[in-house]
Every structure is written in structure tokens, then in C-alpha cells.
Amino acid sequence: MRFDPPLEEGRLLRRYKRFLADIETTTGELLTIHCPNTGSMLNCMVEGGQVWFSRSNDPKRKLPGTWEISETPQGRLACVNTGRANGLVEEALRAGLISELNGFTGLKREVPYGQENSRIDFRLDYPDGPAYVEVKSVTLGFDGTPVAAFPDAVTQRGAKHLRELASLAREGVRAVQLYCVNLSGIDAVRPAQEIDPGYAAALREARAAGVEVLAYGVCLTAEQVFIDRRLEVLLGD
């Protein structure tokens, strides 16, 4: 996935009201841009840190700029636009890069399912039945270690999705939790027990129920981002 038009550079001044960020561009322009991330962005939100943003020409948009990438204190790049994750996964699925999910004959996005009024990110159809795939975007890293963690804030919605997947798996339906790790320099991912122990417990319960837990990393630059490798999942059990 190429960033088109090309991203512009700046430095972060502040993030506020969750969805807003003030930046200064390399030309000295002061802008308020959209922050497309509802998490805490623990290691992605350093005042004065380098950021990259896209700019839309849509006259209907109140804020033409969207925050796309941050440089972390450890010098990694993080794609903070969580809306990119599903597009990256679909691109990789169609290219056959997620080997565990190859062979599908149909792909649908945002399909209603479950008992708690959920929508699954992807339903993949196979000759022997469907697979339901939930995608989470991961950007949290600690102290320069090559292990990312999810979530970066308490997520009741994320735990709900795991319950829904576990219910499917118990009924004999293929259910998959896929972590798209949008952080460079990562080899593995784990649940962030110290941030949301409820989510970590729900993930372990989901896997015990038969949910497949996969993680894939990306190649990320200021020009493009794409899924390029499978990562290890560390559940601590």
C-alpha cells in the first residue's frame, strides 16, 4: 500500500480531545490534523517527535490532514492510523501472503455476526465453510525490545470480539484473531496484561476455545506500508 499522495513531515505539538493533534510542518506551517486512533498511543505520541501526515483535497473535510505515522522514542516507525489495518490485511489476503488463510473463494467485509451485535472484519468463504477473521492494529512497544503488545488502553470492545469468536469456535466455526503489527523492528506480539488484564484473559480463553491467534508484521516507510512476515504470538501460558 503506497501513500498517495505522498506523506508530509512535521513534528507533534500536542494531541487532545482524542481525535485532534496540532503539528508544525517542516515549512513552519501550524496545522490541526485528525488523529485516527482511539487508543492511548503510549509510545507514539511524543511532543516534539517526528510525524508524517496525509493531506486530502476534499473540500468537505473540516480537517484536511490525517496523522499517519509516528517515530517512537526507540526510533521505530508506527503507523498510527488504525483504519489502514483492514486494508493492509485485505491486500495481503488477496496476494496470498497470509498462508494460514489461503484458499478462500469469497471475501466479505463488515459482516454482522454473533450474539452481541458485532461485525466481523472479514468473512472468508471456503469450500468446507466460512472463517471469521477479526483484525486488531498494534503499535505499542516497550523499551526497544522486539515484542509489541495489545491493547494500549482498556478495550471492552476488544474483549467482546474475543467472546464472539470463542462462541463461533465452540460451535465448530473457524474463528481467527489476527494482529496486524504496524510497528517496525518487531518479532513477536503479546497481550498487554499490565494495561488490560481482562483482555489478556479473554484472549487466552478464546484460544482455549479453539480461536486461531495469528500475528503479522509490516514493512513500513514514509512511502509505503505492506504486510511482509509472520510474527510469534506470546500468550504467557
Curated annotation (Swiss-Prot):
Domain of life per record: Bacteria
Q: Which positions form S-S bridges?
A: none
**GO molecular function per UniProt:** DNA binding
Family affiliation: Belongs to the SfsA family.
| NCBIfam families for this protein | sfsA (TIGR00230)
- Protein name, entry field: Sugar fermentation stimulation protein homolog
**Which species does this protein come from?**
Pseudomonas fluorescens (strain ATCC BAA-477 / NRRL B-23932 / Pf-5)
